[in-house]
């Protein structure tokens, strides 16, 4: 597939997702980095987003809970270019009923080449990167060209 560029803005749209056993870890991470995160637009799956808002006061667009379609909502927004960064603390030691949705979410984040953190270390690397508070160009699939080729 051909690629094109997309600009991630200075004020990023960040999706925050955490499985049940990881919610406390994500909440602690958000609290540690609250001063940086409040400069960005935050979205989250339902329970996670409501917990973050309740504990920090940060404005969070809370979607549905992951098992009820929230992971797929985040994935759709990634495909539409509406999410710039995904922080997803998933639990590798416990299966969840919506494992296919989890795989799909991670696949879409990879297809659309957005920064993804699945653990504390990577989340810290992303938020401490000089790119976090500046605009940056990324390569993404050139969907209009892809579609035009398929419709020939």
Curated annotation (Swiss-Prot):
Catalysed conversion reaction: dihydroxyacetone phosphate = methylglyoxal + phosphate
GO cellular component, one term: cytosol
Active site: 71 (proton donor/acceptor)
Domain of life the protein comes from: Bacteria
The enzyme's E.C. designation: 4.2.3.3
Gene Ontology molecular functions: methylglyoxal synthase activity
Domain MGS-like, chain residue ranges per copy: 6-152
Enzyme type, top EC level: lyase
GO biological process: methylglyoxal biosynthetic process
Gene3D superfamilies on file: Methylglyoxal synthase-like domain
Residues bound to substrate: 19, 23, 45-48, 65-66, 98
Keyword field: Lyase
NCBIfam families reported for this sequence: MGSA (TIGR00160), PRK05234.1 (NF003559)
Function: Catalyzes the formation of methylglyoxal from dihydroxyacetone phosphate.
Family: Belongs to the methylglyoxal synthase family.
Identification of the protein by name: Methylglyoxal synthase
Annotated source species: Enterobacter sp. (strain 638)
């Amino acid at each position: 597939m051909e690629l094109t560029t997309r600009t991630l803005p200075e004020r990023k749209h960040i999706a925050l997702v955490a499985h049940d056993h990881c919610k406390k870890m994500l909440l602690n991470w958000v609290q540690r980095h609250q001063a940086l995160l409040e400069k960005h637009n935050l979205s989250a799956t339902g329970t996670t987003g409501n917990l973050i808002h309740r504990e920090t006061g940060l404005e969070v667009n809370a979607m549905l809970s992951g098992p009820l379609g929230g992971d797929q909502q985040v994935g759709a927004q990634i495909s539409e270019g509406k999410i710039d960064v995904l922080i997803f603390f998933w639990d590798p030691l416990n299966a969840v009923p919506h494992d296919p949705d989890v795989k799909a979410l991670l696949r879409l984040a990879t297809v659309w080449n957005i920064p993804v953190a699945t653990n504390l270390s990577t989340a810290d690397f992303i938020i401490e990167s000089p790119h976090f508070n500046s605009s940056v160009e990324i390569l993404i699939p050139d969907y209009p060209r892809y579609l035009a080729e398929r419709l020939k």
